[in-house]
Amino acid sequence: MPSSWGKIFKVSTFGESHGTSVGVVVEGVPAGIPIRLEEIQKDLNRRRPGQSNLTTPRDETDTVRVVSGVFEGKTIGSPIALIVDNQNTISKDYENLRTTFRPSHADYTYQMKYGFRAHVGGGRSSVRETIGRVAAAAIARMILKDDLGIETIAWVDSIGTVQSNIGDKYPKSREEVDQNEVRCPDVGSADQMRSLILKMKEAGDSVGGTIQCVSYNLPPGLGDPVYDKLDGDLAKAILSIPACKGFEVGSGFSGTLLTGSSHNDEFYVEEGTGRVRTRTNHSGGLQGGISNGEELVIRAAFKPTSTIFKKQNTINLKGEETILEAKGRHDPCVLPRAVPIIEAVVNLVLIDAYLYQRAINPQWFQKWARIPDYYKDLEL
């Protein structure tokens, strides 16, 4: 079962929803980088269950432990292992799923692929797998910010039929996004979204939506042509998140409604800085699979949570039709907790692209990177 991502900044996650623990091993992190454990924990706290009545009531602290690769608060160049223990599992709630498949869940496909599966908590298909990604991405986020000034901010753009009205007035900070439990910076729309989620929760149903994400301060040159395009890597990473069913960059599907003369992003030289900029950003910051220096703008679509508390028709392991009445603790809407997960996988793609570009083109690194003091302190 593939569980790794990245060419240079390589992330390998492990663990199941109701196992002893979940975690990640991160390879390719340069030596000498300060690891701020509180920053990793802060990111995990944004993702953790039980944080509001809009999410699953499973109450996990998701406290992270660093077990290797860090000495006296700094990376030493060896693999970094981060572990989070599972503390609040109720496996008996899943006993009826040992031989019964939840509609639209990975139960059936995992069974068909492997012939055996961990039915409790969804096993490896659970969103708890993303704990490892979020923890690893916290390290990536620190490096990207320190070296390049890159900041990645995601937010809930829609829930069901309720659409936010922020347009292209993108939030500039996580604090702006986290001002409400929905994680939508448009407060009026957030109230409507909250009401819709609670309505679905009361009805034993679920609802989906979209998340938008912007990465600021990307330099031009990240990504590779043809098979390793940055948007291709982003698409693969985003669509690997549980419940994610759609992805677009920049104008995305709405760009098909425009003409070339309307959609093309015209270049100009910015006065004062001499930087090449574009007057519009329909491309979402990517052209030919390579960043052009504008904001990276993406959007992801999430389906309604597949585990609901309504009776559903399904089949069992013998191929017999039956009725499923699901138990357990589940999110009525994954969107509020998916925001930090989206940020995480975007940062994992960006850090890998950055370290690769830095390795193959030292002149690019010298031109665009802000070399932090901790690199200068290395005794070589």
Swiss-Prot record:
One of its GO terms (molecular function) is chorismate synthase activity. One of its GO terms (biological process) is aromatic amino acid family biosynthetic process. Reduced FMN (FMNH(2)). Pathway: Metabolic intermediate biosynthesis; chorismate biosynthesis; chorismate from D-erythrose 4-phosphate and phosphoenolpyruvate: step 7/7. Its EC number is 4.2.3.5. Keywords: Amino-acid biosynthesis, Aromatic amino acid biosynthesis, FAD, Flavoprotein, FMN, Lyase, NADP. This is Chorismate synthase.
